[in-house]
A protein has these predicted regions:
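A short acidic, Gly/Pro-enriched loop at the edge of an enzyme's catalytic core
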Residues: 91-98
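A short glycine-rich, Lys/Arg-flanked "PGG" loop and its adjoining helix->strand segment in the class I
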Residues: 116-128
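Class I SAM-dependent methyltransferase SAM/SAH-binding core
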Residues: 44-89
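Conserved class I S-adenosyl-L-methionine
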Residues: 1-43
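SAM-dependent methyltransferase
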Residues: 133-198
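C-terminal lobe and adjacent flexible extensions of AdoMet/dcAdoMet transferase-like proteins
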Residues: 192-231
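A conserved beta-strand element that flanks and buttresses the S-adenosyl-L-methionine
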Residues: 100-102
Length: 231
């Protein structure tokens, strides 16, 4: 898996996600995290750091050394153990009552095998009765869709339903010039995720439209799903 978050992408990441909610995410995750939490694709610690500040033992895995370097610059960032590597295969010490992967990061695995391996790796780290939480979008209905539009950034998703290949095109204004970054993903349906979970020995516990437990419906564009490892 390629590191798409090196250099300036890592440096700008916190700014680009500054408007995303944090407290509702923490409120959702914390009740599952009594036995510690493992974040796959921990990145700059947007969620891991405030979760640790609530008293949760947190560890992480991330492919990008530059993203983790941003985490290390923050207060408390050097206290969270992070393994550098592919979150589908990299192991960390210990077991946890919660593993989680957020903000469409499961789609960074661009093959079905990679996504199944992600579930299997999460399950290996879970103690019996532990839960794996995934936040991800529902596959698009349109071939092209604009997901962000501002004076300095335009984001366009290009989706091929036949291959489930999604490419996010980011056009960013930098020093008066527009720069493009195109990142590949594999979009995956809730039903396919449920099957991946079964392969990994997990079972669906709950599914919601968002962090405040809004009902998931046929009109939902994303979901927060929880799978449980049998006790």
């Amino acid at each position: 898996m390629k590191d798409w978050f090196a250099g300036e992408v890592a440096e700008r990441y916190d700014e680009s996600t500054a408007d995303m909610p944090v407290e509702p995410v923490l409120d959702f995750l914390q009740p599952f995290a009594g036995g510690g939490a493992l974040e796959l694709a921990i990145g700059t610690g947007r969620i891991a750091l405030p979760l640790a500040q609530r008293g949760v033992r947190v560890a992480g895995i991330d492919l990008s050394p530059d993203m983790v370097a941003q985490l290390r610059k923050k207060p408390g960032g050097d206290e969270i153990p992070v393994a550098i590597g592919d979150y589908a295969t990299t192991r960390v010490d210990g077991s946890f009552s919660l593993a989680y992967i957020l903000f469409n990061s499961i789609n960074n695995q661009t093959t079905q095998d990679g996504q199944v391996a992600t579930f299997e790796n999460a399950a290996r780290h879970l103690e019996p009765g532990g839960c794996f939480v995934v936040e991800v979008g529902v596959p698009a209905r349109e071939r092209l869709s604009v997901f962000d539009l501002s004076d300095t950034h335009v984001g366009v998703d290009e989706y091929d339903a036949d291959t489930q290949r999604l490419v996010s095109h980011h056009f960013t204004l930098v020093d008066g010039r527009w720069e493009r970054l195109s990142m590949p993903f594999r979009s995956v349906s809730p039903a396919e995720l449920d099957l991946m979970a079964r392969i990994a020995g997990l079972r669906l516990h709950e599914r919601w439209n968002g962090w405040k437990r809004e009902p998931f419906t046929s009109e939902s564009t994303r979901h927060v799903s929880v799978w449980e490892k049998p006790a």
